[in-house]
């Protein structure tokens, strides 16, 4: 029997600050099966969790005011990132919410038997940053999203038993190539349905052939 899995996108981001520990803890409490998140790298090489390359959309100063200067997470150290509040953009009740380390989220997941799904943005990481990320994932039950077959191969070469989520272009040839190195039980192929909330999607939508 097929089982529906509930995924918390950036944690429970409709009620809590996205990609923060409160949102991830809520995922556990509310019974989600998977936490989807977005790793990022600070200037000093720490793997944190943040969707945008700039901190400005979700970061606030301690008094709640916006950060006016454009600041890229890769241009500041982890200690510098901790000076900002990542909860106040949503509500005062989430004040003093700091940017989380990926290692802290992996620990939460391990303690609560919930899976972590890594976004495909890691495909743009440098070789050094990707290796740091892979080292963190050693021994975890994390899953990785890949938008290219080449990157999926790289993931499986490193983690032969890892579950791969493929959200790249889907056609018969792509599925054939994936099946050559990813076991059927370890592969999820994402096919978006066309609706208002998926207008931004750049891969082909589901149709009579897919």
Regions found by a protein language model. Name each.
Residues 1-210:
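Phosphate-group recognition and catalysis centered on beta-loop-alpha active-site segments
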């Amino acid at each position: 029997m097929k089982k529906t899995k509930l995924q918390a996108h950036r944690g429970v981001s409709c009620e809590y600050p996205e990609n923060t520990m409160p949102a991830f803890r809520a995922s556990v409490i509310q019974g989600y099966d998977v936490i989807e998140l977005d790793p990022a790298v600070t200037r000093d090489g720490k793997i944190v969790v943040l969707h945008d390359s700039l901190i400005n959309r979700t970061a606030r100063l301690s008094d709640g005011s916006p950060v006016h200067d454009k600041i890229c997470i890769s241009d500041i150290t982890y200690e510098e990132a901790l000076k900002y509040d990542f909860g106040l953009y949503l509500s005062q009740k989430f004040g003093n919410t700091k940017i989380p380390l990926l290692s802290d989220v992996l620990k939460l997941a391990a303690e609560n038997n919930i899976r972590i799904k890594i976004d495909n943005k890691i495909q743009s990481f440098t070789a050094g940053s990707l290796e740091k990320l892979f080292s963190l994932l050693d021994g975890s039950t994390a899953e990785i999203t890949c938008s290219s077959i080449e990157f999926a191969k790289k993931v499986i070469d490193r983690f032969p038993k890892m579950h791969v989520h493929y959200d790249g272009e889907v056609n018969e040839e792509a599925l054939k190539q994936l099946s050559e190195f990813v076991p059927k039980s370890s592969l999820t192929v994402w096919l978006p349905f066309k609706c208002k909330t998926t207008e931004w999607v750049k891969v082909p939508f589901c149709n009579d052939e897919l």
